[in-house]
Swiss-Prot record:
EC number per UniProt: 1.2.1.70
Pfam families (UniProt xref): GlutR_dimer, GlutR_N, Shikimate_DH
Protein name (Swiss-Prot/TrEMBL): Glutamyl-tRNA reductase
Other comments on record: During catalysis, the active site Cys acts as a nucleophile attacking the alpha-carbonyl group of tRNA-bound glutamate with the formation of a thioester intermediate between enzyme and glutamate, and the concomitant release of tRNA(Glu). The thioester intermediate is finally reduced by direct hydride transfer from NADPH, to form the product GSA.
Any GO BP: protoporphyrinogen IX biosynthetic process from glutamate
Source organism of the structure: Thermosipho melanesiensis (strain DSM 12029 / CIP 104789 / BI429)
Classification via InterPro entries: 4pyrrol_synth_GluRdtase, 4pyrrol_synth_GluRdtase_dimer, 4pyrrol_synth_GluRdtase_N, GluRdtase_CS, GluRdtase_dimer_dom_sf, GluRdtase_N_sf, NAD(P)-bd_dom_sf, Shikm_DH/Glu-tRNA_Rdtase
Pathways per UniProt: Porphyrin-containing compound metabolism; protoporphyrin-IX biosynthesis; 5-aminolevulinate from L-glutamyl-tRNA(Glu): step 1/2
Taxonomic lineage: Bacteria, Thermotogati, Thermotogota, Thermotogae, Thermotogales
Gene transcribed to yield this protein: hemA
């Protein structure tokens, strides 16, 4: 029952992460047939496969091999717990990663041990945030994107065009509405755009095919879609003024060459602003680390007991079998009334239980 992790961490360059992009459900289904237990955690900044076994359930492309992280045993547990608590995020303590770990546990986790591990990770993530208040301030990537805009221009009254109405896009819109921006939104599925309109009446809906017309007249353009290709191409942007482009997508949705004529920020650029806000949360780290170490001990105790669970069950069943056999032999050799037989049976079971219990506790102590 060897616990392992293989994947790409948050420090992996975007162009490498793009080479290891996949549909979670299809990828998860393909791995399930290759190993007894597996879990897939995919976010904007990481691609991680947790599994039980000695052999990696996938072939690593030589291009991404230099960036691969591999962990085993307690290091896997500590890594996931740090991830769920937001200690391994671009934004220290950010809440979105906890939702992503929870999603993995619910939809992309297979096997008793990994289910237990991810359940503990989700529980710990909630405990860490509740006890320390590390997420008191909204420091998600979407929030940092808006703060980045505020450092460049006064948002109030400015035309800001948001492409994509998923979770990230919705958060951006929420922050922009509170700052009085003139917001335009577009989504390939127009129905979803109207759903956002119900949530934020201030927004204006743009047909996806008309997006370039509005891009050219915008002060800021934010892309937050799940498209596997460029949604904004440099040659189609017709504007003499400097437009601030922010690409919150993975893979990237805004053609990189656009920065030759305009201002472009990607997920990597947000790291600089995140450092400023991380200082507000640094004091909480030691408390969370203590919570992590306590939870690691709890999980490892459970994990180690699983290795001897079958042995313990065997001993208990064998003891019951031997007691039954001895009572059967005794009842045939000695004529006893029912009451006497019950008393002997009770005493024999009690004695056996104490002996078995002693040995089981000894085994547990040795393992733990």
């Amino acid at each position: 029952m060897k616990l392992n992790l293989v994947g790409l961490g948050r420090n992996t360059p975007i162009y490498i992460l793009e080479k290891f992009d996949f549909d979670e459900q299809e990828f998860f289904s393909s791995l399930k047939v290759k190993t007894t237990e597996v879990a897939v955690l995919k976010t904007c900044h990481r691609r991680e496969i947790y599994y039980i076994g000695d052999k990696e359930p996938l072939t690593i492309n030589e291009i991404i091999e230099p960036y691969i992280i591999r962990k085993s045993g307690i290091d896997v547990v500590r890594h996931l717990f740090k991830v769920s608590c937001g200690l391994d995020s671009m934004v220290l303590g950010e809440h979105q990663i906890l939702s992503q770990v929870k999603n993995t546990h619910k939809n992309f986790c297979h096997g008793k041990i990994l289910n237990k591990l991810f359940n503990e990770a989700v529980s710990l993530g909630k405990e860490a945030r509740t006890k320390t208040g590390i997420n008191k301030y909204p420091l998600s990537i979407s929030y940092i994107a808006v703060k980045l805009i505020e450092e460049q221009i006064n948002i109030e009254g400015k035309k800001i065009f948001v492409i994509g109405t998923g979770m990230m896009g919705q958060k951006v819109i929420k922050y922009l509405v509170s700052r009085g921006a003139d917001i335009y939104i577009s989504n390939r599925t127009i129905k979803k755009a109207y759903e956002i309109k119900k949530m934020f009446s201030e927004v204006n809906i743009v047909d996806f095919e008309e997006k370039y017309k509005h891009i050219s007249s915008s002060d800021v353009v934010i892309s937050a879609t799940n498209a596997p290709h460029y949604v904004v191409e440099e040659k189609k942007v017709n504007s003499q003024k400097n437009i601030i482009f922010i690409d919150l997508s993975m893979p990237r949705n805004i053609e990189p060459s656009i920065k030759e004529y305009h201002t472009l920020y990607t997920l990597e650029d947000l790291n600089e602003i995140s450092k400023k806000y991380n200082k507000l949360r640094q004091e909480k780290i030691s408390t969370i680390q203590n919570l992590i170490e306590t939870r690691i001990k709890k999980f490892l105790t459970w994990y180690k007991l699983q290795t001897v669970k079958d042995d313990i069950l065997y001993i208990q069943n064998l003891a019951e079998k031997l007691v039954y056999e001895e009572i059967e032999k005794l009842s045939k050799k000695i004529l006893l009334d029912d009451n006497s037989l019950k008393q002997i049976q009770k005493s024999l079971k009690s004695c056996t239980k104490k002996i078995v219990s002693y040995h089981i506790n000894y085994i547990k102590e040795k393992v733990i």
